[in-house]
Each structure stands twice: as structure tokens, then as C-alpha cells.
Amino acid sequence: MALKHDWTKEEILEIYNKPFMELLYDAATIHREHHDPNTVQVSTLLSIKTGGCPEDCGYCPQAARYHTDLEGNDLMSVNQVKAQALRAKASGSSRVCMGAAWRNVKDGEEFDNVLEMVRSINKLDMEVCCTLGMLTENQAQRLAEAGLYAYNHNLDSSEEYYKEVISTRGYQDRLDTIGNVRKTNVTVCSGGIIGMGESEADRAGMLVALSTLNPQPESVPINALVPVEGTPMEEQEPVPIWEMIRMVATTRIVMPETQVRLSAGRTQMSREGQAMCFFAGANSIFAGDKLLTTPNPDVSEDMEMFKMLGLNPQKAFEKKSQPESVAAEKSKYQSQGEKPRWSRPEHKIDRNLEAQQNAKTKA
């Protein structure tokens, strides 16, 4: 059966709102047609540069304009990252995703160091993913040459609700970055967050945006908002587990071949709830004691859960072969001293402005 790239919001809403047991059955059936239901990818998310981001994302404690008591750190060294990757591999992870709190990639020493990090992790026979903000086609090509397996750039929500969350960067800017990644052999990881105050129609809208990409993203992380004090969304109520399961199941039906990743918010989910998500089609998790800045179950807890459920960690490069890594001196693509161009909507989001004012008061 050919993948469908013309899903409408109405079609996706109809799936999302099916009777719960029917939705689970449909999703589980499709999941088994495309994936081993007993195999789950384990990925470790590593914050290589924390805090100080100039964006105003309403959910994010790394935004410099909000007061969140976050302890920032400069870019980690290549050796520090390699040591963390070795630790992750020993714990059962097959992928390392490096996150830097940047609006965009800038050519120069720091990006050169990130490229070396990619090379060093690739040599450990692990899948390497990065989430570094916006990037140009040339920068994407250089990451691909270094041996990058995946690039993460989330859409966050529907295009309509996105405007209630972020004013410093447009939705199309995110799609443009995904487009630049698609011009290389790097796979795309892109998903979003539920629980930010969006409607079911917004959740469907996000899945429309993702599923109509051709090809569809190889990975789609589904995050449940973790409210952080000091951010504009600090008072949002936790997402009910039933909504998370519905979102996972709908994503699986709409994008059958994609790896659906249970991401932020797992500390709020029982093992029973997570098991239902796996049954509904989730086949990837982020492991480690925190995801960038938010709490996450300990790896040993996850391995215990896997044992209980009869799940096996996915081996590296099961979905796609290991990328070749080219040494810096042999690189076909050189620094052009460029940075991405992006729109600056700069419309007013009241709760973001209020949190920003509160931060000034506390300072």
C-alpha cells in the first residue's frame, strides 16, 4: 500500500476521534505491517550547549528572555561528547542526538567542533542526530559529509497555533530547514508538542504538515509539554495519557513507516501508559536522566520496563545503512561564512511578553 501524502485535517481528526479500542486496533495493525512490535529504538539526547537562546518559544526554559533558574553551559568539547556517547552505547542506546540552544548554525569554530563530534560518534558505530536550529544547504551538506544520520527540526504545532507559541521565527523557516536537510542523504526527524493549549484540530494540523512532506520524516517525536516555572506555559495542565495514546496512534496510522518517538513527558506517564503507547505504534524513546533540560526516566528504569514488556532495543542502522564519514581536510564542502536567512514575524504573544516582564522583575 502506497504512502498517503494528501491527508486532510478532517480525515486526521476523524481518525483521532475514533472509539478508543478501534483506534488502538487500527494503529497496532498498521504498526505490525511495517515494524517489529517488540523492537524499540533507544536514543540518548545530549545537551551540548545549554541556555542563552535568543528565541521566544513559550515552552522553552532555554530562552534567555525568561527567568527559569536554568544553569547554562558553553559548547562541550569533542572528548566530553565522545565520553557521553560511549556511556550511552553501554546503556543500550543506538543513537545520540546532540542539541545546542542556538537559533541557527553559524559557520566558524563552534560548528567545526560539532562536525568533529559527529565524526567521533559515527566512528563508534552509533547513529548521530543533531538539533542545532536553522541551517543552510551548505551546512547540511557538511553535516552529511561528517557522517550525520539524522537532523531534528520540530514543527512544534500546527501553522495556526504556532503563532501563539513563537514570534521570533516563522513556520516556513522551519520547513525551509527541513528542505535543506532533504537535499542531503541525512534523514529528517520532526515532530511537535501537545499540551500547550492547542486544540485537537491543531494536533491534526501538525500531522497534516508532517505527513504531506514527501518523503515523510523518518522520525516523528511526540512530546508532552513539561511546564517549567518562569516560562509562559508554566501553568499548563499535564496532558492526559489518553490524549498521548491517541496522538501516537493517529501518527502511526497517518505515517506508517515513520519511527514514532515517545519524547518529553515520560516521567508523568505510568509504565502501563507507556505500554499502551508502544502498542499504539510508538517504537522509539529518548533515554537518559534528562532531555536537554527536562527530567526523564533513568536508563535502568527503561531497561527494566523493556524486560517487563518483552521489548528489545533496536540496533543501529537497522532502517538505513551507516553514513560514510569524510575527514575535515577531505571535505568537498567548505565554510562559506554564512548563516540562514529567516523571517521575523515579531507579532505580540501576551503570555510570552508577560513572562519576559516577570523575568526582568526577578532580575
Curated annotation (Swiss-Prot):
Keywords: 2Fe-2S, 4Fe-4S, Biotin biosynthesis, Iron, Iron-sulfur, Metal-binding, S-adenosyl-L-methionine, Transferase. Its cofactor is [4Fe-4S] cluster; [2Fe-2S] cluster. Residues 316-353 have a biased composition (Basic and acidic residues). [2Fe-2S] cluster binds at residues 97, 129, 189, 261. Residues 354-363 have a biased composition (Polar residues). GO terms for molecular function: 2 iron, 2 sulfur cluster binding; 4 iron, 4 sulfur cluster binding; biotin synthase activity; iron ion binding. CDD domains: Radical_SAM. This is Biotin synthase. It is an enzyme of class 2 (transferase). Residues 38-266 form the Radical SAM core domain. Its EC number is 2.8.1.6. Binds 1 [4Fe-4S] cluster. The cluster is coordinated with 3 cysteines and an exchangeable S-adenosyl-L-methionine. Gene3D superfamilies: Aldolase class I (3.20.20.70). Pathway: Cofactor biosynthesis; biotin biosynthesis; biotin from 7,8-diaminononanoate: step 2/2. The gene is bioB.
